[in-house]
Swiss-Prot record:
InterPro entries: CELF1/2_RRM1, CELF1/2_RRM2, CELF1/2_RRM3, Hud_Sxl_RNA, Nucleotide-bd_a/b_plait_sf, RBD_domain_sf, RRM_dom. It comes from Xenopus tropicalis. Residues 283-312 are annotated as: Disordered. Phosphorylated during oocyte maturation and dephosphorylated following egg activation. Dephosphorylation is calcium dependent and correlates with the increase in the activity of EDEN-dependent deadenylation. Residues 16-99, 108-188, 405-483 form the RRM domain. This is CUGBP Elav-like family member 1. One of its GO terms (biological process) is mRNA processing. The keyword Cytoplasm applies. One of its GO terms (molecular function) is RNA binding.
Length: 490
């Protein structure tokens, strides 16, 4: 059978043009026709060939059109992912050609909302038949068989569906409905998957914020010992008033610095040291930094009780008030202030006492180590101000931080951009750059990026919290970026 003797000159109107892959390159139209005609009469076979070769060689795929739609579907059911042709390693791939998608059901199917619950399928068909031939109309019903007040209508062409949308959307309010009728294209499977992914991302980000709010209060115990020591040195050596000595020596510049760093802020920083030390059961913290009627006393009393368990951490509820005050202190201690303090200390080094100089250095170093913990304790409060500071230059930048402060992040969602990456990693410290890499050919994300902090402690905190964090169906891979001396950055 050659398919042309028993049929008219053209295939049926509803016939399907199929794409067929995993075909031997040595096969011609003759061998392919013998394979497919056992499922029905074949109208046309077109082998795709590489015209750059002489003679042109088969690319191992073809287009085939049967006279009937039934024959095409039977061939697909029997061959797709089922039969391996001679000399091939994978089964035949057979699916409708891209040109057939122009009239796919999803492009002709309408969702109709705010429908009267008194309507049935015939009423819906009568309402929309004026716009063209209807292939299917269906009312959505609950388990009890009652209408849910919405329906699907499928036309035979997309143009008919578009006319129905234009004429019917919000054109009337049906009986028993609070809003006008809604007529739009029904969600495709891709649309549903994207909505599900978005919902999952939102839920996971909320869970991350909740975990940061409470879990990371106990995580203060991971604060590096050197930062605790620096904070304790600042508070216990009588240096709460030492910055006042900078005023007559530094003039207006020193005045600006000390106005952003008052005794209460230093006291709050000391309170954080006490809280972290208490979480680590460091006996000296409570005795060295006790101050009555202050956030400090709350924090020390919450974690340094003699009868507390050796593995206990700071009570989150008891410490929340103190950490709120701490957030106010860190808001005044931005990166620019600390940089100015460091410059002031260096410029007036010969005039300042050793005690004051060491205090400034200690405070500057300690701040960089505790910044992420203030963010973890109060993420919503902290992120609003931090995003305005960091977002101006960090998102999209490829500026690198110091050694050990640069991260490589893999398995990012396809839709994530620079700003999303920045916001995800801000709670752990001061981000100097956040960059998602884009494929120049497709302009789509490569699903990996880099984040750089201004200190290694923040990078380690981000790795501990975010490595393995699940987004959608994948888990983030977060690790230190290799140094420039290595052949690969990751």
């Amino acid at each position: 059978m050659n398919g042309t003797m028993d049929h008219p000159d053209h295939p049926d109107p509803d016939s399907i043009k199929m794409f067929v892959g995993q075909v031997p390159r040595s096969w011609s139209e003759k061998e392919l026709r013998e394979l497919f005609e056992q499922y029905g009469a074949v109208y046309e076979i077109n082998v795709l060939r590489d015209r750059s070769q002489n003679p042109p060689q088969s690319k191992g795929c073809c287009f085939i059109t049967f006279y009937t739609r039934k024959a095409a579907l039977e061939a697909q059911n029997a061959l797709h992912n089922m039969k391996v042709l001679p000399g091939m390693h994978h089964p035949i791939q057979m699916k409708p050609a891209d040109s057939e998608k122009n009239n796919a059901v999803e492009d002709r199917k309408l969702f109709v909302g705010m429908v009267s619950k008194k309507c049935n399928e015939n009423d819906i068909r009568a309402m929309f038949s004026q716009f063209g031939q209807i292939e299917e109309s269906r009312i959505l019903r609950g388990p009890d068989g009652m209408s849910r007040g919405c329906a699907f209508v499928t036309f035979t062409t997309r143009s008919m569906a578009q006319m129905a949308i234009k004429a019917m959307h919000q054109a009337q309010t049906m009986e028993g409905c609070s809003s006008p009728i809604v007529v739009k294209f029904a969600d495709t499977q891709k649309d549903k998957e994207q909505k599900r992914m978005t919902q999952q991302l939102q839920q996971q980000m909320q869970q991350l914020n909740a975990a940061s709010m409470w879990g990371n209060l106990a995580g203060l115990s991971s604060l590096a010992p050197q930062y605790l020591a620096l904070l304790q040195q600042t508070a216990s050596s009588g240096n709460l008033n030492s910055l006042s000595g900078l005023h007559p020596m530094g003039g207006e510049y020193a005045t600006g610095m000390t106005s952003g760093l008052n005794a209460m802020q230093l006291q709050n920083l000391a309170a954080l040291a006490a809280a972290a030390s208490a979480a680590q059961n460091t006996p000296s913290a409570g005795s060295a930094l006790t101050t009555s009627s202050s956030p400090l006393s709350i924090l020390t009393s919450s974690g340094s009780s003699p009868s507390s368990n050796n593995n206990s951490a700071v009570n989150p509820m008891a410490s929340l008030g103190a950490l709120q005050t701490l957030a106010g202190a860190t808001a005044g201690l931005n990166v620019g202030s600390l940089a100015g303090m460091a410059a002031l200390n260096g410029g007036l080094g010969s005039s300042l006492s050793n005690g004051t100089g060491s205090t400034m250095e200690a405070l500057s170093q300690a701040y960089s180590g505790i910044q992420q913990y203030a963010a973890a304790a109060l993420p919503s409060l902290y992120n609003q101000s931090l995003l305005s500071q960091q977002g101006l230059g960090a998102a999209g930048s490829q500026k690198e931080g110091p050694e050990g402060a640069n991260l490589f992040i893999y398995h990012l969602p396809q839709e994530f951009g620079d700003q999303d990456l920045l916001q995800m990693f801000m709670p752990f410290g001061n981000v100097v750059s956040a960059k998602v890499f884009i494929d120049k050919q497709t302009n789509l994300s490569k699903c990996f990026g880099f984040v750089s902090y201004d200190n290694p402690v923040s990078a380690q905190a981000a790795i501990q919290s975010m490595n393995g964090f699940q987004i959608g169906m994948k888990r983030l891979k977060v690790q230190l970026k290799r140094s420039k001396n290595d052949s690969k950055p990751y």
